[in-house]
Amino acid sequence: MFVKKGDKVRVIAGKDKGTEAVVLTALPKVNKVIVEGVNIVKKHQRPTNELPQGGIIEKEAAIHVSNVQVLDKNGVAGRVGYKFVDGKKVRYNKKSGEVLD
C-alpha cells in the first residue's frame, strides 16, 4: 500500500473532497485509511467503565485508499512510485519527482 501512517494526503473523492489532512491509521489488509477529520460518523456508544453515561460519539471512519493522494513537502498531490536511491527502495511523487520517505 502506498500510503503510510503520518502521510499528509488530499481527499480526491467523496463528501470531504479537497480536504488535506494526516493519515491516522493505515489498514493494508482492507486497502483503507483513517484520515484525521474526514468521514466523520456518529456512533451509538453503550455505557462502559470508561464512559459510564454512554451516548452518541463522533469519530473518523475508514475511506478507501484510492480516494486519497499523497502530498509532498511542497503540497503537490500526485501518484506514488517506487525507485531505488543508494540501494534503498523509497517512495516518490510521480508528478513532482520528490522523494517522500
From Swiss-Prot:
GO terms for cellular component: ribonucleoprotein complex; ribosome. The keyword RNA-binding applies. Gene3D superfamilies: 2.30.30.30. The keyword rRNA-binding applies. Keywords: Ribonucleoprotein, Ribosomal protein, RNA-binding, rRNA-binding. One of its GO terms (biological process) is translation. GO terms for molecular function: rRNA binding; structural constituent of ribosome. Part of the 50S ribosomal subunit. HAMAP family: Ribosomal_uL24_B. PANTHER family: MITOCHONDRIAL RIBOSOMAL PROTEIN L24 (PTHR12903). One of two assembly initiator proteins, it binds directly to the 5'-end of the 23S rRNA, where it nucleates assembly of the 50S subunit. One of the proteins that surrounds the polypeptide exit tunnel on the outside of the subunit. Belongs to the universal ribosomal protein uL24 family. This is Large ribosomal subunit protein uL24.
